[in-house]
């Protein structure tokens, strides 16, 4: 850790007074008395300060202060007593961690320190109250920012953790927004070759993913969401790239994806329509013979 004096310089586009303010707020994170306001101000400014992440990471005690904010609310998780005020405060800390997670200069160190694991207790929560929903969504946002970078090290790290079952649970029972971010994270893991191989490595893993995606399709046929459906279809399409998964999907792909159930929802979404057509084509083509030598019956 370095002192603030050696932190990465802020581009000169920021006025000198703003730069001094940023330094002041970062210093104020170290003190419990001034931390809450500093969290609020820095989270508001995070979009306009391109190098905020290195400044946070390399300044003394800052990351420890952000982690303290997270750990402080663990007792409010079970039993679930989290208030709106507590939720807003910790979500400001999470917003700053998201900034560190998505910056190329700090992402590797962020993973090496295993900081995402501090957020997993929040993803385990099931309370439907607004403070908890906001907490889950913001925590998912940090993981979403990591996978958005399409970096192999991110996927390798996540596969050593319980992120897939956590995402699957939120995909099954979260709010529409949380479901969308959780499905996006799963999609990004699947789009990586290591991630696809990991999920298709055992029948248990694949069947868990396929079961949840199937439930989501059923739910989406009753309460359509074009944005969520797009991610679900992309997950199915990517699974169909794996020969073993493709065979299984021939048996378990929901009928709603084969008929006109979603025609109205997708009428203006050419990308998802193309993915869906490709998925159906993949499942129809190249029916391989069973390794035991018995030809598989045509579907």
Swiss-Prot record:
Single GO biological process annotation from the record: cytokine-mediated signaling pathway
KW Transcription (keyword) present: yes
Principal subcellular localization: nucleus
GO terms under cellular component: CCR4-NOT complex; CCR4-NOT core complex; cytosol; membrane; nucleus; P-body; protein-containing complex
Keywords for the protein's UniProt record, in alphabetical order: Acetylation, Activator, Cytoplasm, Nucleus, Repressor, RNA-mediated gene silencing, Transcription, Transcription regulation, Translation regulation
Location(s) in or outside the cell: Nucleus; Cytoplasm, P-body
Cystine pairings recorded for this chain: none
Superkingdom of origin: Eukaryota
MF annotations from Gene Ontology: epidermal growth factor receptor binding; kinase binding; protein domain specific binding; protein homodimerization activity; transcription coactivator activity
Annotated positions of the N-acetylmethionine modification: 1
Tissue-wise expression: Detected in spleen, thymus, prostate, testis, ovary and intestine.
Coiled coil segments of this chain: none
Listed PANTHER family: CCR4-NOT TRANSCRIPTION COMPLEX SUBUNIT 9 (PTHR12262)
Subunit structure: Homodimer. Component of the CCR4-NOT complex; distinct complexes seem to exist that differ in the participation of probably mutually exclusive catalytic subunits. Interacts with MYB, ATF2, RARA, RARB, RARG, RXRA, RXRB and RXRG. Identified in a complex with ATF2 bound to target DNA. Interacts with NANOS2. Directly interacts with ZNF335.
Family statement drawn from the similarity comment of this UniProt entry: Belongs to the CNOT9 family.
Function, in words: Component of the CCR4-NOT complex which is one of the major cellular mRNA deadenylases and is linked to various cellular processes including bulk mRNA degradation, miRNA-mediated repression, translational repression during translational initiation and general transcription regulation. Additional complex functions may be a consequence of its influence on mRNA expression. Involved in down-regulation of MYB- and JUN-dependent transcription. May play a role in cell differentiation.
This protein's name: CCR4-NOT transcription complex subunit 9
Species of provenance: Homo sapiens
């Amino acid at each position: 850790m370095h002192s603030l004096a050696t932190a990465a310089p802020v581009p000169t586009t920021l006025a000198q007074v703003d730069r001094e303010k940023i330094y002041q707020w970062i210093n104020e994170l170290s003190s419990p008395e001034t931390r809450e306001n500093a969290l609020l101000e820095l989270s508001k400014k995070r979009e306009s300060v391109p190098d905020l992440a290195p400044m946070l990471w390399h300044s003394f005690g800052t990351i420890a202060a952000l982690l303290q904010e997270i750990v402080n609310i663990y007792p409010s998780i079970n039993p679930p007593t989290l208030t709106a005020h507590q939720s807003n405060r910790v979500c400001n800390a999470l917003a700053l961690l998201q900034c560190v997670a998505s910056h190329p200069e700090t992402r590797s160190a962020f993973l090496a320190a295993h900081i995402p694991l501090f957020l997993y207790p929040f993803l385990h929560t099931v309370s439907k109250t607004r403070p908890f929903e906001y907490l889950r969504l913001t925590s998912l946002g940090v993981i979403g920012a990591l996978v958005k970078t399409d970096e192999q090290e991110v996927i390798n790290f996540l596969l050593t953790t319980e992120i897939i079952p956590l995402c699957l649970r939120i995909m099954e029972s979260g709010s529409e927004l949380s479901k969308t971010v959780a499905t996006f994270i799963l999609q990004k893991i699947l789009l990586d070759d290591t991630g696809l191989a990991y999920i298709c490595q055992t029948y248990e893993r694949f069947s868990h993913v396929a079961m949840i995606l199937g439930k989501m399709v059923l739910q989406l046929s009753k309460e359509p969401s074009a944005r969520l459906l797009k991610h679900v279809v992309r997950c199915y399409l990517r699974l169909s790239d794996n020969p073993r998964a493709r065979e299984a999907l021939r048996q378990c792909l929901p009928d709603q994806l084969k008929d006109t159930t979603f025609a109205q929802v997708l009428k203006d979404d050419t990308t998802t329509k193309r993915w869906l057509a490709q998925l159906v084509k993949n499942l129809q083509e190249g029916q391989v013979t069973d390794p035991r030598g018995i030809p598989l019956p045509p579907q």
